[in-house]
């Protein structure tokens, strides 16, 4: 079943992709004053003038057309991912909309800006210097805020809550052509309650996660209708569970490390059933096997064969004996 999120570079500290590294490329005269001809909103002339001076000294301001062309050519999937309007913050005092600004690192930012401390604050879009990743969302003092969309050029994305630049809280993660997960995250990984559609292995899972793996209780259903409901540990069936196979067979009991192991009950689609000990998906130990209600074997098993002491019950008769690999070698 595998770790749903280990196969993509999307899992990383998002803030490392979008950190302002200091000096920016100097703009040519006139660009800044043309784009900022009047102070927007309620910011004071003094604050605004200071911002213009810094931008003119340190920033390269690119045109809106160039910015949109980069997005349309490098991130064509951006518009297919709905961004919730409730997470677009309303500008407050000293926060205003800045045009596309290119840092010396090559990173590009367009969005809300704090004119007091000259840092990204509010809602904005940032494109990494190599144009491989884009962040659209909330900013706080030049760092990724509490909510946003982290999108890779190949279409992989995370949309949801962040904490200190990491995926944390509720979110949605899609690895194109491989899987889509919706649920809770912690430290960049699924952790808590969550649902995953695995397109590669053709299954859906709903349940508990820990550190990117299925841990706790859950329901796993494959496209062929094989279905498991029960306990998981490290992505494997482990504990008490029920598995229903596509042909109608059913097992209910204990699992260890992904295998049927321990006490359990198996019912075949033709009515036969077994109740007893299992080891590695095979009858091993003590158990009862019913051919029907009138005939059953009670005794010892080895690798799916009657082996050791046992009794065959047929109607009201009993036959005690010693068995060896499914055949009686001594009995009455």
Indicate where each model-derived feature is located.
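Intrinsically disordered, low-complexity repeat tracts enriched in Gly/Pro/Ser/Thr and acidic residues
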Residues: 1-332
């Amino acid at each position: 079943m595998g770790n749903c999120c280990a196969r993509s570079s999307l899992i990383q500290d998002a803030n490392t992709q979008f950190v302002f590294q200091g000096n920016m490329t100097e703009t040519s005269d006139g660009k800044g004053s043309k784009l900022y001809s009047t102070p927007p909103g309620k910011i004071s002339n003094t604050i605004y003038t200071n911002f213009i001076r810094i931008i003119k000294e340190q920033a390269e301001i690119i045109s809106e057309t160039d910015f949109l062309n980069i997005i349309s050519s490098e991130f064509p999937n951006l518009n297919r991912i709905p961004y919730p309007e409730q997470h677009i913050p309303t500008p407050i005092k000293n926060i205003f909309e800045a045009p596309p600004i290119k840092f010396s690192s090559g990173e590009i930012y367009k969005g809300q800006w704090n004119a007091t401390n000259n840092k990204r604050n509010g809602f904005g879009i940032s494109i990494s210097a190599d144009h491989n990743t884009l962040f659209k969302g909330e900013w706080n003092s030049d760092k990724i805020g509490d909510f946003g969309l982290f999108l890779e050029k190949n279409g992989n994305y995370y949309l949801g809550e962040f904490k200190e630049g990491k995926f944390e809280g509720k979110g949605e993660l899609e690895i194109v052509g491989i899987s889509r997960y919706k649920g809770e995250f912690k430290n960049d990984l699924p952790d808590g309650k969550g649902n995953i559609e695995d397109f590669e292995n053709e299954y859906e899972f709903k349940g508990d996660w820990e550190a990117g793996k299925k841990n706790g209780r859950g329901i796993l259903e494959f496209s062929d209708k094989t279905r498991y409901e029960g306990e998981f540990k490290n992505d494997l069936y482990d504990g008490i569970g029920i598995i229903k196979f596509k042909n109608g067979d059913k097992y209910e009991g204990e699992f260890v490390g992904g295998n049927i192991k321990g006490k359990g009950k198996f019912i075949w689609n033709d009515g036969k059933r077994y109740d007893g000990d299992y080891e590695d998906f095979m009858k091993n130990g003590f158990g009862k096997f019913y051919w029907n209600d009138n005939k059953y074997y009670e005794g010892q098993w080895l690798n799916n064969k009657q082996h050791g002491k046992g009794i065959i019950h047929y109607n009201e008769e009993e036959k005690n004996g010693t068995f060896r690999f499914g055949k009686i070698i001594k009995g009455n």
